[in-house]
Amino acid sequence: MAKDRLTAESHKSAEQKEKNRYCTDIKLAIHKSAERIQLMTVAVLALQGAFIEHEKILSKLGADSFEIRQKKDIDRSFDRLIIPGGESTVQGKLLRELDLYDEIKSRIEGGMPVYGTCAGLILLAKSISNDSAKHLQTMSIVANRNAYGRQLGSFHTEAQFDGLGVIPMTFIRAPYIDEVFDDTEILSEVDGKIVAARQKNQLVTAFHPELDADTRVHEYFLNM
C-alpha cells in the first residue's frame, strides 16, 4: 500500500513538474513574441480606407507603425506592410499614380510579410473572378469582389481560424476567395466560403479584425 502510494505521488509530482515546465515555456514564448513585436516597424498603406484602426491595434500590441501616403514614405525602413480595407479600385489606381506600385510589389515578391484586409485581399489576388482589373497580383488566390456586398451587406459572425480558435469577424461589403492554388493555405471559411488564407509571407482576410477588440489575427501576422 505504502509503495503504491509513493508511486502515485511520484507520478503526480512528475505530472506537476511537466505542467509547470509547459506553463514556463508558454510564458517565455509570449515574452519573446512581445519583445520581437516591439522591435518591428509596420507600414500601413494610408491612401484610402480603414487604416487608422489597424494603427490602433498595432499600437496596442506594442509595434511601431507609420503611414504610407506618398512616394517618399516608401523609402523609410519597415519590416512588414498592411493593406487596409476600402475601395480596391481607388487604392489600385492611387498605387500607380503615386508611383508606389512597383516598389510595394517588389518588396512583397522579395518576401516581406504583407497583410491585406477586404480590399487588400483583392489587391493581392492573382485574379478577380468578377472584375477584369489587375492589381499587385502577388498571391495565388482568385477573389470574388463585393461578393457579400451584393447579397448580405455588412454582418458580424464568429468562426474558426486555423491556429487561433474561434474569432469574431466583421464583414463590410466584403469579398471572399473563390479559389486558392499553388501553396496557398486556407485559414478560415464561413458558410463554405473562403474568408482567410495565407501563402508564405502573404496573409489575407475578407473580414476586418481591426474593427473588433480581438487582436489575435494581427498577432498572427506580426509573428509570421
Each PLM stretch: what is its role?
Residues 9-17, 24-25, 29:
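Short, low-complexity, charge-dense intrinsically disordered segments
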Residues 9, 145-224:
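Amide-donor transfer/coupling interface in amidating biosynthetic enzymes
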Residues 65-66, 114, 202:
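Hydrophobic anchor at the start of a short beta-strand
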Residues 82-83, 116, 205:
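Redox-cofactor binding/interface segments in oxidoreductases and associated redox assembly factors
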Residues 32-97, 102-107, 215-219, 223-224:
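N-terminal beta1-alpha1 cap of cysteine-dependent amidohydrolase-like domains
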Residues 88-159:
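Cysteine-nucleophile active-site neighborhood
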